[in-house]
Amino acid sequence: MEDFKGYLQKGGFKQQHLLYPLLFQEYIYALAHDQGLNVNASTFNEPPEISGYDKKYSSLLVKRLINRLYQQNTFIHSVNNSKDNRFVGHNKNFYYQMISEAFAIVVEIPFSRRLVSSLKEKKEIPKYQNLRSIHSLFSFLEDKFSHLNYVSDILVPYPVHLEILVQILQCWIQDVPTLHLLRLLFQDYHNGNNRITPNKSTYGFSKDNPRLYRFLYNSYVVEYEAIFVFLRKSSSYLRSTSFGPLLERTHFYRKMKHIGVTCCNDFQKTLWLFKDALMHYVRYQGKSIMASKGNHLLMKKWKSYFVNLWQCHFHFWSQPSRIHINQFPHFSFYFLGYLSSVPINPSSAKSQMLENSFLIDTVTPKFETMISIIPMIGSLAKAKFCNLSGNPLSKPVWAELSDSDIIDRFGRIYRNLSHYYSGSSKKQTLYRIKYILRLSCARTLARKHKSTVRAFLQRLGSEFFEEFFIEEDKILSLILPTTSYSLQQLSRESVWFLDIIRINDLVNHLDL
């Protein structure tokens, strides 16, 4: 038990060992290479107090599954036509699924404990909760992007082959059994899914093992962003000086006197970066935004850097078309369900000196966020609330629910959307969404009662839906002082909430 505590208390970015090699170390290497194991039969005859069957996740249970999995591997290899033995194959896939889920849970323990302990030491847990809000990204963009010139819209690629993700973990995890077990899970996935082409293997694995894939994908993102942040900090104090972007896998090297000269091991050519003190980078899920006050040449160099980074360091090809460079204010980028832009707002001020008066024309860039109606209607159509033209449809699946449950579901969807899109500077699209959801709700109720929408609304009245479709500005009027904002002003202002920690499901459809 003291050894477990020692492994959990290890500090630093790299994790020397994880928990599960201590439990499975004598089995993983042999299992990965199909070598024989002397499994003791008494292993499967222990009482529940030891086996821990009453727990949701038991390390001993996973260890038994590995033993059984190896025994089935030996039996399957002895059968000429293994496709006919569907029962054994089904159990094998089930065992692999349980092992991969336990693998993902255990591998997250050191990182989660390290995060919680660091937050407790700094006593910034409340602030951290606020920073988790998606809307905090937009408040950052609103404050910074109005002073920038160029923006790069980047679709972050993901490795096509799962082996690339294992290689990334080699600089994090130093125990060999961990990598053997991970490769074993990937190998079984490929063997059991021959219908999936290699180009779609990563995507399929993300659907079958979402938790494990999320951990592997985050490790890939952390590594490439760590390299990017290092080069970004190095370029901030250099004067048009060239330096080879480092890419040694485990450590970053710098020479003395803050000269960022590094070993160029994985790049085929040297990239030239320029000084830029105003560069901002924001990422959420698989999309990132990089904005700068520099010139177009600088943005092209960073684009070339990203393409070469993915190609030479991570060994997979990324199309340059995944990175779009545009200039404000002639560009709008789509991010987290919002269509954002930095338009120039002209204004005039009257000035008077003695007896002479004159007008001063000024232009002020302002960060604006709007809701794009066409993708939003497409998302509602995908969820079967309307067709692609925006005409509301009934929800036959909900017709068997009670009237109050049906209205509550529609009302909750609208309130969540209105809450998420409170940062929009133009609320007309929200009124269109409200119209679609209200009429879809009315058609669902009319379908349930075998009546027409007109007759149903005449019998109950349009006020019947009002308490379920509460406007966001009415909620804001209860929160903010009425002397500061009127309802008309609130409809034109962007309001960001710090309690939104995930994207709305309908907004998620827009990124598919």
Swiss-Prot record:
GO cellular component: chloroplast
One Pfam family recorded for the sequence: Intron_maturas2
Main location: plastid
GO process terms (BP): mRNA processing; RNA splicing; tRNA processing
Keywords linked to the UniProt accession: Chloroplast, mRNA processing, Plastid, RNA-binding, tRNA processing
The keyword Signal is assigned to this record: no
Listed GO MF terms: RNA binding
Matching InterPro entries: Domain_X (IPR024937), Maturase_MatK (IPR002866), Maturase_MatK_N (IPR024942)
Compartments it resides in: Plastid, Chloroplast
Family: Belongs to the intron maturase 2 family. MatK subfamily.
PANTHER family in alphabetical order: MATURASE K
Function according to Swiss-Prot or TrEMBL: Usually encoded in the trnK tRNA gene intron. Probably assists in splicing its own and other chloroplast group II introns.
Protein's UniProt name: Maturase K
